[in-house]
Design a protein with these regions (language model features):
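Double-stranded beta-helix
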Residues: 39, 51, 59-95
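Solvent-exposed coil/turn segments that connect beta secondary-structure elements
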Residues: 7, 28, 55, 77-78
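Extracellular/periplasmic catalytic domains that process cell-envelope and extracellular macromolecules
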Residues: 14-15, 22, 42-43, 63-68
Length: 95
């Protein structure tokens, strides 16, 4: 499980295997692609499911000003690791 607090997002990254994600509480904000644009993220409310396809670039987190953190249960085949699209930048961003 992961908890994203308001105003924090991951940098664009991908995984070697599919990730299956269920939002347990709060609203999670997600986007696909290698270009970081937090204003273009899509809200995913509690109870929703997201499938991240292996090797597809994406980023996610909770937008600044959100009422609460988002808690997400993530599963998939392992072991795996995140591959940052731009390893010269931090793996998470304060937005």
């Amino acid at each position: 499980m992961i908890r994203w607090h308001p105003g924090h997002m991951s940098a664009p990254h991908y995984y070697d295997t599919d990730r299956l994600c269920v939002v347990l509480s709060g609203t999670w904000y997600v986007a696909s692609g290698a270009d970081f644009a937090p204003e273009e993220t899509v809200p995913v409310p509690s109870g929703s499911f997201v499938r991240r396809i292996a090797k597809s670039a994406h980023y996610d987190g909770v937008r600044k000003g959100a009422a609460e953190p988002a808690i997400i249960a993530i599963t998939g085949m392992g072991p795996t690791r995140a591959h940052l699209i731009d390893p010269s930048k931090p793996g998470w961003r304060h937005v």
